Amino acid sequence: MEKAERRVNGPMAGQALEKLQSFFNRGTKLVTHHLHSLFFYKGFIYVVIGFLLGRAFILSEVLPFALPFFGAMLLIRRDKAFYAVLAVLAGALTISPKHSLLILAALLAFFVFSKVAAFITDDRVKALPIVVFFSMAAARAGFVYAQNGVFTTYDYVMAIVEAGLSFILTLIFLQSLPIFTVKKVKQSLKIEEIICFMILIASVLTGLAGLSYQGMQAEHILARYVVLSFSFIGGASIGCTVGVVTGLILGLANIGNLYQMSLLAFSGLLGGLLKEGKKAGAAIGLIVGSLLISLYGEGSAGLMTTLYESLIAVCLFLLTPQSITRKVARYIPGTVEHLQEQQQYARKIRDVTAQKVDQFSNVFHALSESFATFYQASDEQTDDSEVDLFLSKITEHSCQTCYKKNRCWVQNFDKTYDLMKQVMLETEEKEYASNRRLKKEFQQYCSKSKQVEELIEDELAHHHAHLTLKKKVQDSRRLVAEQLLGVSEVMADFSREIKREREQHFLQEEQIIEALQHFGIEIQHVEIYSLEQGNIDIEMTIPFSGHGESEKIIAPMLSDILEEQILVKAEQHSPHPNGYSHVAFGSTKSYRVSTGAAHAAKGGGLVSGDSYSMMELGARKYAAAISDGMGNGARAHFESNETIKLLEKILESGIDEKIAIKTINSILSLRTTDEIYSTLDLSIIDLQDASCKFLKVGSTPSFIKRGDQVMKVQASNLPIGIINEFDVEVVSEQLKAGDLLIMMSDGIFEGPKHVENHDLWMKRKMKGLKTNDPQEIADLLMEEVIRTRSGQIEDDMTVVVVRIDHNTPKWASIPVPAIFQNKQEIS
């Protein structure tokens, strides 16, 4: 029976505990929500700040806080300014009625000077500090004169000091008060903005002067709590800065508290240095720092008071929810939370951008399909529809007025249609005149045969023109469809690149972190996006030191771990001291190229019909191209140069090279009716594996020189611009380090005089070359060809030479101990 009761009571007790915990959580959230609404949405926070700033003063009699706060409130939260001024006056009354009267006088002067400033300028933000300055100076001068009846030099100086401080505090409050507004704070705060915010906090703490319990000052406790919180959030630099600023303001309020600047600064420094020990470490730093400075400042007399004040501040710090410290840390530069916030923001921007690019890609793809469908539908139209249209035009001018119309087209429709169709086809093929049987049959059948024959001949000319125009339009649609599809694919690839997410390589990340930390390098974070051979992509977050560890140490170590040359692709240094750098590592190119070119116009002129280009395509491809325009001179130069420019733009956009050449061909063939064309010789080298694609359109052969061997590369394609549609033949070759790729126009290849076999002559000259320098080879080949012509340049000449070599990195790989290296798993 007891067991049964325990079994029943156990679950019931658990359910009751869960209900109690749920009720407590709901209550906590409700209270937090109401407090947040009360302080920030309803503006009670400004009442609290105004009350404490009304109590705040420095140098025993200077009141520079109240009027700047009210002026800033008028600009930032005008709807809460009335409550703020009441709070300021109430706070001043708790000190003395004299303070309250001075602030009231300053407010009245402020309204007067504001009206004057409104007539001078419309920029209220720029005018506010000046208005506050004159208002505070006038109020102090009038108050002192009314009180004493005289105005001494000391009073002048104090009035100017008070007005100057009010001027500066107005600028500071304009920067710091917006942090308390309901609107979302920007992603990060500058160091200057943090200092302005701390001056505001310290000014508010000054208003707590005089509140004490058994010798423990309220402003001391809260000041240490603020310094401890910021040292834990932002580290030693932020903690020390906050300590100096807070201590300085408290010291100005009470000369006896001047040592607090040293105490708070040193405590903030120690707390920040010990932040790695979590809250306990930062708390120990505060206690040790405050005790040490207290021993030097006050001796053993106030040691226990200082200890109690620090312990209370530590208790408040330990009771502060971690969610609050994390939320504040998001706005402090250099913190991990700020870095994560930045990454999250960048990820959101990336997703939005990728979504937009995807939408554009889908639009272009839909347009491409629409054009392609229309183009295919046009191609699938049967010849019968064309024949029907043609015959309808013939009958309209002949059979409509014929007396045999009913017999031919009603009673014998099929026979009439077939006979006229046969006559049309025979006439189109130029065989009707010789086909006596068909001609006789048609003349016997049709009473207007002569008229119909003439109409068919005339209409055929118009019909052919119509078909030619229709073909042009169809080719244009096909070109647009292919281009839109190419653009869609490029944008889809770009979207995938934007949306690139890190792959799950937890084991490899741990191995890399352990290896680097064993070497003495601190790594904050590692993200591996890809370990694909030749496409490695790793990003790291490391402390910024400015000594180039990324390039000199980390990249060489990764090269040994991954068995592939790694280099720094991008590095973003932290603009703040003790911040973090974001470094991207990637595969380096396995090969590099060096180039040379020689170029000459016919007859030594300035304008050549040849054009050439050498360019990098992305990170791992290199392209060289030569175009030879038909003939010589300006027109040929225009054609070849236009071909090269179009090729560069299209290839750089990422569109496939075959589509690029087809597009250029369609553009050049459609844009004019002149019989012009240009050749194109294109080579694309993959710098990762040294493979090479040759796309030759009406061009001369290319040559690969490998040691003493010379290999010819050629393909048979018509020149660009002759026909509207053709298939590009692609020739692939595998290059090796040390190979020389030699491309040339027909002016070089066919230039040698009295040479029957140009291939053998060119190979013999290449084998005889004693240099491997690309520029020297280009110059020597051109010189040899010109020499065979007795120094005459009888055609445009262009030769391009590309040498491929292994890419040797700047820094050699650093061996990693085998205990940290599991290359099978890494790769």
Curated annotation (Swiss-Prot):
Gene Ontology terms: cellular component: endospore-forming forespore; plasma membrane
Transmembrane domains' residue ranges: 49-69, 71-91, 116-136, 142-162, 175-195, 206-226, 247-267, 269-289, 299-319, 320-340
Gene3D superfamilies documented for this protein: PPM-type phosphatase domain (3.60.40.10)
SUPFAM superfamilies, A to Z: PP2C-like
Cited PROSITE patterns: PPM_2 (PS51746)
Known role: Normally needed for pro-sigma E processing during sporulation but can be bypassed in vegetative cells. Activates SpoIIAA by dephosphorylation.
PANTHER family: STAGE II SPORULATION PROTEIN E, STAGE II SPORULATION PROTEIN E-RELATED
Name of the protein: Stage II sporulation protein E
Species assigned in the record: Bacillus subtilis (strain 168)
GN (gene name): spoIIE
